[in-house]
Amino acid sequence: MEKNWYVVHTYSGYENKVKTNLEKRVESMDMTDKIFRVMVPVEEETEVKNGKSKQVSRKVFPGYVLVEMVMTDDSWYVVRNTPGVTGFVGSAGAGSKPTPLLPEEVDAILRQMGMQEERQVEIDFQLKESVKVKEGPFANFIGTIEEIQLDKRKLKVHVNMFGRETPVELEFTQIEKI
């Protein structure tokens, strides 16, 4: 049996309580080999009230908790009967096993929460290489790559404007090799 991520429906506002309850049940019922992670997806936002900014955590999916588990009768029973859980998302009726999330969906959620590195983009550009700008206000200008910022997916390119070298920040998709 392989482990997958499943979505559990809870009473709205009880997501963290369900997470705590389920983690305690997993420990007490010795299910650590079947139920691995319980997660309430949140994202950090900056909220401005009365001119003051404050960091707040906002639930991405209110009323839902993600559970990484191996689906067996026992693990299914433990999760379903946790206080606050109203059922699994994707089960077609009473007693039927739910459908797991697709790996791409899990990757997107974990990336959104900052828990997984975004897959690196392969770039085929080198410093001091001559390139042509494909789009934007500098379209058709020829320039030289001076800096590559992989984390931002941008490049600093010096283009010749009015007889002077001018630094321009561009995205990878805005340039092409010449």
Curated annotation (Swiss-Prot):
InterPro entries for the chain: KOW (IPR005824), NGN (IPR047050), NGN-like_dom (IPR006645), NGN_dom_sf (IPR036735), NusG-like (IPR043425), Rib_uL2_dom2 (IPR014722), Transcrpt_antiterm_NusG (IPR001062), Transcrpt_antiterm_NusG_bac_CS (IPR015869)
Q: Which GO terms describe its biological process?
A: DNA-templated transcription termination; regulation of DNA-templated transcription elongation; transcription antitermination; transcription elongation-coupled chromatin remodeling
Report the Pfam families cross-referenced here: KOW, NusG
For this UniProt record, the keywords arranged alphabetically read as follows:
Transcription, Transcription antitermination, Transcription regulation, Transcription termination
Report one GO cellular component.
cytosol
Provide the leader sequence positions: none
- Similarity comment: family membership: Belongs to the NusG family.
Q: Which HAMAP family match?
A: NusG
> What does this gene product do?
Participates in transcription elongation, termination and antitermination.
> What PANTHER family does this protein's entry cite?
RHO-INTERACTING TRANSCRIPTION TERMINATION FACTOR NUSG, TRANSCRIPTION TERMINATION_ANTITERMINATION PROTEIN NUSG
- The entry's protein name is Transcription termination/antitermination protein NusG
What species is given as this protein's source? Answer: Halalkalibacterium halodurans (strain ATCC BAA-125 / DSM 18197 / FERM 7344 / JCM 9153 / C-125)
